[in-house]
Design a protein with these regions (language model features):
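Non-cysteine beta-strand/loop elements that form the S-adenosyl-L-methionine
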Residues: 39, 90-98, 157-167, 219-224
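Active-site beta-loop-alpha junctions enriched in small/polar residues
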Residues: 17-19, 42-44, 69-71, 96-98, ...
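Active-site beta->alpha loop and helix N-cap motifs at the rims of alpha/beta catalytic domains
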Residues: 64-133, 138-145, 155-156
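N-terminal small/glycine-rich loop or linker at the start of catalytic domains
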Residues: 1-13, 45-63, 97, 102-105, ...
Length: 335
């Protein structure tokens, strides 16, 4: 897949997620086969004020796209130019986030209500940057205002290189099912690449989205949490057939490796604090996970964290289905 002058090896992308897609997570996604990673959402105004203190791109994390959000055309254009100068391989502009604070500020999905402003912003940004420029949108504001096709055509006319669409409305948030049919409608309406997003939780669903909608790529967000195996597309160009749920031993090994990546970036104390949420996602749905998650909340040291992880996986592997993790009957296991 090609974005402007950027050739990508694989059609699976890691979606930008606030508080999640930091450097270690992007690194892991790339190692697992992800074709393009995105930074966490970056405030255009914040980037202009704080520069490198607000955004750092490492030499070994290419290709990477910086996703910006904002509502002021001049500010967004200046921030895009800065991100490009700082090493971004592509710039993405967020018009899909339904978060209350963004919407109230006239940013994110709120912009889809104002097509003329969208045109103004994209035209100005396109004039400022030479790198591939993409946008992230939703279906529209609500069920009575589905305008993804209209916004996509405007973007194409402004010289945007690709469009990512999450086919839910602002009102839906993340409820209900993503309307994949709308991805296909957008694809038919424009000539630039279209990337689908929404409800992809395993490699087979990514393949299904590509085939069903005709889209050029698949952006994966929540489906990658605790599940880096989802980027199951390899250099051979064939989809790798893997079980939907990796073996327990593989999960435990991945947790350890992922933690080391986080520790190398944030330091040991920062890693313990930052990594707990990832452990929740890796172990979600396993027997006794609720009790295990409760125990994690009080852990502050690396040694205690790994002791708890080891004890928990030992508990699960022994098949203690009828006991809760940490109960009296398995206290010898948990220490």
């Amino acid at each position: 897949m090609r974005l402007g002058n950027l050739q990508l090896d694989h059609p699976l992308f890691l979606a930008p997620m606030s508080g999640i897609t930091d450097y270690p997570f992007r690194q892991l996604a790339r190692e697992m086969g992800c074709g393009l990673v995105f930074t966490e959402m970056v405030s255009a105004e914040g980037l202009i004020r704080k520069g490198e203190a607000f955004l750092k791109i490492k030499k070994d994390e290419h290709p990477v796209s910086v996703q910006l959000f904002g509502s002021n055309p001049e500010v967004i254009a200046e921030a895009a130019q800065m991100a490009e100068a700082m090493g971004a391989d592509a710039i993405d502009f967020n018009m899909g986030c339904p978060a209350k604070q963004l919407v109230e500020a006239g940013a994110g999905v709120d912009l889809m209500r104002f097509p003329e402003k969208v045109k103004e912003i994209l035209t100005m940004v396109r004039r400022k940057v030479k790198s591939p420029l993409t946008i992230k949108i939703r279906s529209g504001w609500d069920s009575k205002n589905i305008n993804a096709v209209e916004i996509s055509k405007i973007a194409e006319d402004c010289g945007i290189d690709a469009i990512s669409i999450h086919p839910r409305t602002k009102d839906q948030g993340f409820r209900g099912r993503a309307d994949w049919k709308l991805i296909g409608e957008v694809k038919k309406a424009v000539r630039i690449p279209v990337v689908g997003n929404g409800d992809v939780t395993q490699p087979s669903l990514a393949k299904e989205m590509l085939e069903e909608t005709g889209c050029d790529g698949v952006m994966i967000g929540r489906g990658a949490l605790g599940n880096p195996w989802i980027f199951g597309f390899k250099n051979s160009g064939r989809w790798e057939e893997k079980p939907a749920t990796p073996p327990l031993g593989e999960k435990q090994r991945m947790i350890h490796y992922h933690f080391l990546l986080v520790q190398a970036h944030w330091g040991e104390k920062g890693a313990v604090k930052t990594f707990r949420k990832h452990i929740y996602w890796y172990t979600k749905g396993l027997p006794g996970c609720s009790s295990f998650h409760s125990k994690l909340s009080g852990i502050r040291e690396k040694e205690a964290l790994f002791e708890a992880i080891h004890s928990y996986f030992d508990f699960v592997q022994k098949g203690n289905q009828c006991q809760s993790f940490g109960s009296a009957k398995n206290r010898s296991v948990t220490g």
